[in-house]
């Protein structure tokens, strides 16, 4: 019996090498494209474009506050600054809100572990003890990789990261951060900037009529 003749593989040779190179290029291109879709999300340029959770854990779109002035604050119940700040925030919200202005409070336990309560209890505590009527959202993290995206937007825009409770970020009707204040700064310092922005909102609404 004669041995079988050895035949050369058809895929060997220059054409096969070219095909392999082209296939590698295509695979690399597809892989890079998929990675871009996964990691390169469109840049959000407005605070009001985010969604957050309310104190009961329900999703809330911040779009509802677009067109108003907002003072966004990281709050805490067991801080030496709690009384003064909650009362001051209540005063501002009563004076300028709710049609043209709102305080938006985000509880956080990362600064001195001053907010150990669950979100619902934080809201109840603030309403009962200080009579606040402004929105109090779900407890969040601000620092680290688990930082709430909406609040991180404020931090990144202002280049100012909170170092304690009750940092305040003033957001204009378009969702841009225009100013920030540290917790020890009195309400009297904050009021003129809020008043100026609210005045602009009122004038614009009259012009649009």
Curated annotation (Swiss-Prot):
Q: Name one GO cellular component term.
A: endoplasmic reticulum lumen
Q: Where are the transmembrane segments?
A: 18-40
Q: What is its EC number?
A: 1.11.1.9
What is the enzyme's class at the highest EC level? oxidoreductase
- What is catalyzed by this enzyme? 2 glutathione + H2O2 = glutathione disulfide + 2 H2O
One Pfam family in the UniProt entry: GSHPx
Gene Ontology terms describing biological process:
cellular response to oxidative stress
- Keyword Transmembrane assigned: yes
Mind listing the GO molecular function terms for this protein? glutathione peroxidase activity; peroxidase activity
Subcellular localization: Membrane
Q: Which CDD domains match?
A: GSH_Peroxidase
The superkingdom of the source organism is: Eukaryota
Q: Which residues are named in the active-site annotation?
A: 79
Topology relative to the lipid bilayer, per the entry, is:
Single-pass membrane protein
- Which residues, by range, are in coiled-coil regions? none
**Keywords assigned by UniProt?**
Acetylation, Membrane, Oxidoreductase, Peroxidase, Transmembrane, Transmembrane helix
Instruction: Mark the residues carrying the PTM N-acetylmethionine.
Output: 1
Write down the NCBIfam families for this protein, in alphabetical order: gpx7 (TIGR02540)
Q: Which family does it belong to?
A: Belongs to the glutathione peroxidase family.
Q: What is this protein called?
A: Probable glutathione peroxidase 8
The gene name on file is: GPX8
């Amino acid at each position: 019996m004669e041995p079988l003749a050895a035949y050369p593989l058809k895929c060997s040779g220059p054409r096969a090498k070219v095909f392999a190179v082209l296939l590698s290029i295509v695979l690399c291109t597809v892989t890079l494209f998929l990675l871009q879709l996964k990691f390169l999300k469109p840049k959000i340029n407005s605070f009001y474009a985010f969604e957050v959770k309310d104190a009961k854990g329900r999703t809330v779109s911040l779009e509802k506050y677009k067109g108003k002035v907002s003072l966004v604050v990281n709050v805490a119940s067991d801080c030496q600054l709690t009384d003064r700040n909650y009362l001051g925030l209540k005063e501002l919200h009563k004076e300028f809100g709710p049609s043209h202005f709102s305080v938006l409070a985000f509880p956080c336990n990362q600064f001195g572990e001053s907010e150990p309560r669950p979100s619902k209890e934080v809201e109840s505590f603030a309403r009962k003890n200080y009579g606040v009527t402004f929105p109090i959202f779900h407890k969040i993290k601000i620092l680290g990789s688990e930082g709430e995206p909406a609040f991180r937007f404020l931090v990144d825009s202002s280049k100012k990261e909170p170092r304690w409770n009750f940092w305040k970020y003033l957001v204009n009707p378009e969702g841009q951060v225009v100013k920030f204040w540290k917790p020890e700064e009195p309400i009297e310092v904050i009021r003129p900037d809020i008043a100026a922005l609210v005045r602009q909102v009122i004038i614009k609404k009259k012009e649009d009529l």
